Amino acid sequence: HAMNPILSFLLWLGAHTVPANHLTDEGLRIKPSDNLPMLRALGRDPLIIKSSRTDTIYGLTELMGAALNSAPNLDRPTLVLGAANDELVPSEAHQSLLRLLETEHNAVTYPNGWHMLLRDLQAKIVWRDILSWIRNRHAPLPSGDGREPKNSK
C-alpha cells in the first residue's frame, strides 16, 4: 500500500467496527480541481454522492492497493496521467505505480493538473493528449508534457 499506515489502520478499524458510518469531505479542505464552477455544480447536483460508508471507502482503498500490486502484470502499452496538484492520490502512490510498470508506458504529470484532470480548467489539454496517444502512442503529446516511452521492448 502507498497509503499512510495510520490512516490505513483507522480506515480498517472503522470498516470493521462501524461499517455503515457515513463519512463526508467536510472539514478536510481538499481541493479536487481548479474548476470551481464545476465543483459548485457538483455540490448542487442531487445525484452526486456526498457521503460514503466507511466500508465502501475501505473497499475502494483496498481495490486501489490491489491495482497497484497488479501493475507488474499489465502487459499493454499504457498512458499514465498524473496531476502535480492532486490532493487525493499521493505523489508516492503515483511514483510507485510508475516504478512497478514493466510494460511500455508513457507518463505525464500535468504541472497545473488536479485530481479531476478531465474536468479541470486545463481539461482540453489532457483530452488532446489522450486522443493523440490513442492515435499514435509513439508521437510526442501535443502538450509537450509527455516523456519518452519507458520500458520500451
How should each PLM-predicted stretch be described?
Residues 1-53:
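Alpha/beta-hydrolase-fold enzymes
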Residues 49-50, 85-89, 116:
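Acidic catalytic loop of the alpha/beta-hydrolase fold
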Residues 74, 80-82, 86:
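Short beta-strand/loop motif that positions the catalytic acidic residue
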Residues 76, 90-100:
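Short alpha-helix in the alpha/beta-hydrolase fold that links the catalytic acid
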